From Swiss-Prot:
Part of the 50S ribosomal subunit. Forms a bridge to the 30S subunit in the 70S ribosome. Pfam families: Ribosomal_L2 (PF00181), Ribosomal_L2_C (PF03947). The gene is rplB. Residues 217-279 are annotated as: Disordered. Signal peptide: none annotated. This is Large ribosomal subunit protein uL2. InterPro entries: NA-bd_OB-fold (IPR012340), Rib_uL2_dom2 (IPR014722), Ribosomal_uL2 (IPR002171), Ribosomal_uL2_bac/org-type (IPR005880), Ribosomal_uL2_C (IPR022669), Ribosomal_uL2_CS (IPR022671), Ribosomal_uL2_dom3 (IPR014726), Ribosomal_uL2_RNA-bd_dom (IPR022666). Coiled coil: none annotated.
Length: 279
């Protein structure tokens, strides 16, 4: 993936590292039939109160409707373009099926214009872009866009550069064991679909935004340190000068422990499917 380090013509771009999209993307115009408008809420609820901090502003962007289900079975599709999607870190591909229907999918690494891909509930070629039930994929294969429940659509392994590896079947034969990019090992029901390959834009983690204005363009507002606030605004606030937080552990603005606390629900049914937690 081409990475470009911007020349230091000003302080704002001195350390900037960006993806050279011109060498990767094939078009800058999305398919109109697969684009819808989004209304911004700036982190507010229906009462106008802030429920998510640090959201607001940013450039206008339209949502691309992505086919996460890959449920057009046994219909060959041809890749027409590799495009940028402002709503996710990976690239997307426009594919056209035999009957003329157009859909967007998450673009895997090494997928090229003109490639023909297929979704099936039977055994097909294990090649990049093909989607099939996870039980039919051989051990050692890297996959993405994995369903957690059959027919619900891919919910895991969708961000740039991510992938999961098939490790084999469990002792009952009802589940397939996969290793996620986080290191977690878990069971996936055999009927769940997965797509072959690694998600595109694998160098996304090397990007350096360079200046605060880039985050403002993305709709991310500044984060104020709790220690810089007053004591009625934050548990870390108050004191003379640079005072310590005054607690046995860092706290959230609402007084809860902030670091090293597990947030997963202990009663979640899917806990039984996790063989080894992430590292």
């Amino acid at each position: 993936m081409p990475i470009r380090r911007v020349k230091a013509r000003s302080s704002g771009i001195r350390q900037t590292v960006i993806i050279d999209y011109k060498k990767v993307l094939t078009t800058s115009t999305p398919e109109k039939s697969l684009v819808v408008s989004l209304k911004k809420h700036s982190g507010r609820n229906n009462n106008g109160k802030i429920t998510v901090r640090h959201h607001g502003g940013g450039y206008k962007k339209k949502y691309r409707i992505i086919d996460f289900k890959r449920d057009k079975i046994n219909k060959v599709a041809t890749v027409k373009s590799i495009e940028y999607d402002p709503n996710r870190t990976s690239f997307i591909s426009l594919v056209v099926y035999e009957d003329g229907e157009k859909r967007y999918i998450i673009a895997p690494k090494d997928l090229k214009i003109g490639d023909r891909i297929l979704s099936s509930n039977k055994q097909i070629d294990i090649k990049v872009g093909n989607a099939l039930p996870i039980s039919l994929i051989p051990e050692g294969t890297f996959v993405h866009n994995i369903e957690l429940y059959p027919g619900r659509g891919g919910q895991m392994i969708r961000s740039a550069g991510s992938s999961a590896q098939i490790l084999g079947k469990d002792e009952t034969g009802e589940y397939t064991i996969v290793k996620l990019s986080s290191g977690e090992v878990r069971k996936i029901a055999n009927g769940c679909m997965a797509t072959i390959g690694v998600v595109s834009n694998e160098d996304h983690n090397l990007v350096v935004i360079g200046k605060a204005g880039t985050n403002r363009h993305r709709g991310i507002r500044p984060t104020v340190r709790g220690s810089a606030m007053n004591p009625n605004d934050h548990p870390h606030g108050g004191g003379e000068g640079r005072s310590p937080v005054g607690h046995d552990a860092p706290r959230t603005p609402w007084g809860k422990r902030h670091m090293g606390v597990k947030t997963r629900n202990k009663k979640k049914q899917s806990n039984a499917l996790i063989i080894r937690r992430k590292k």
